[in-house]
């Protein structure tokens, strides 16, 4: 029988033991994995998870569930410890790891997670109940091609107030997906707002096709057209 001493012998000085993570998303081998604390994200995603599906380019991993944060590819060597993950703006949380490839729109991903936390708000405090709703409205406008100058600053302002004023952990962490995507993928927000362009090709309202003179009117393309 191995007790607490054996468990504490694994991991790092500040983050001892092991942690179970749920690998999901654009990963070749998803599922539940138990790893010693201190293993890097790269080791978890590539040595255990087998890498990105269809050998696409790794873009980010969302850690900590819907109120966690997105960690970009250039931080893939970050050790999986509570303190190191916190430094990125994400959290270890319940152990969720949602992997994203180059075809993932980070603005739409932030909208998706915020929609969940907005729905889960108990409604007791105004900061969470109304603040997350206002943030979601801005994100929906941006992904629908109706972003405005000042939207990014408004998102940051609302996020700060929600984190400071919410009564419980849900509201205090709800803005994390937005804040981390703004921190690491701000250019995608700017592309959506100012260039009306979704580089990942995920936001249908920002996809535009031009019919050239070469078109014969066969309608074959209509079966594949996403808009």
Descriptions of predicted regions:
Residues 1-208:
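Redox cofactor-anchoring modules in respiratory/redox and cofactor-processing assemblies
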Residues 127-133, 210-211, 220-227:
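Iron-sulfur cluster-binding cysteine motifs and their immediate structural context
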